[in-house]
Structures are given as structure tokens and as C-alpha cells.
Amino acid sequence: TSTGASTFSVTLGSGAGTFTSTLTGLAQGTTYFVRSFATNVQGTSYGAETSFTTQTTPTVSVTATPTSLTTISAVGGGTISSTGGATITTSGLVWGASTNPEITLSTKTTNGATSGTFTSSITGLTQGTTYYVRAYATNYLGTSYGPNITFTTVTTPTVSATATVTSITGTSATGGGTISSDGGAAVTARGVFGDILRLSDKG
């Protein structure tokens, strides 16, 4: 919210009739109470009190936790809970490797959402990488951001051990391993692979 006057008074010429005045130097997002007045030699009279609220930057109350994570993409979103009284010109998501990403980055989406909840695809990511994402909305007074949310893209599983083969007979044996990380996605297949040649020699 910008700084500005907490009170003001405007004097405009003289004479009876209808008049208008431009009120300047006000603070953004502030409610003011106003009365018109007229003065003559007998004193000052006032019109009925009315109020107005100046416009401000939008309010982005939510950055959604990204879903549908893959190695290179995700789906995120946000909620614009207030337009600030002015038209939203652009909104979307912005992300990066550091906290508090801003729209000066090229890694952002541009949506047509002007209020409420929206979703947006996050693309061009690197697997197994942690990102920070914020929803944003812009009007002519500036840009506001939602909270920081972190997410990590999917990567291949981590197999931390191959078990020692046991129960060896002439035609069978028992093998196994340990999967210490699923890489951020469900493991759809697992097992033991073998050959009569050293696997490291096969390239």
C-alpha cells in the first residue's frame, strides 16, 4: 500500500451550482469519508457524508501446491481474492530455483484469470530439482504475489543395494535389492536383472 494523505481539503472558486473536483495525493487501498461544503458570510454548511475506497494492487491469497508432477512439468495454480478495485491485466505463476521468484524471470505463465481460482501448467523443468513457485496478479498499480510453495520434480528411483544372492541351487537362486527412493513417483516395476556376462562389461 502506498503512502498518501490521511486528510484533504479542496477549495474550488465561488458561486452556487454543481461543481466537481479531482482529489489527489491519496493513499492506495484507503477508505475516505467526504462531505462537500459551501461558505458565505454567515458561515459554512456541509452536504451529506459519503465514502469511497481508493484502488490498490490485487490480493493473491493462495499459491496451490503443484500436482501431476513429472520429470519436466507440473500443474499449479492460485487464488486471486481481490482485484484491488482495478482490472487485472495479467496473472499466472512464476517459478525459479530461489525463494520469492518475481515476474522479471522468464520462467512464468501468463493467464487470463481476472479473479478467483486458476490453474496453470509449469513446464521446462529439470528432473529431481526443487523449485519455488508463486502465483501472481497484476493491475495498473502493480503486481502482488501469493505465498512461496516448494516442489521437487520426479526423477528415476534410487536402488541403494543389490542383495547378496542366496539359496543357490543348480537351476535357481534368490536375489533382491533395496529401493531407497521412489524418485517422487510410484514404482511401477521392480526386480532383478542378470546375465552370464558382467553387466558392467556390456555398457
List the predicted regions and their residue ranges:
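Short, surface-exposed linear motifs at loops/turns and structural transition points
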Residues: T1-G203
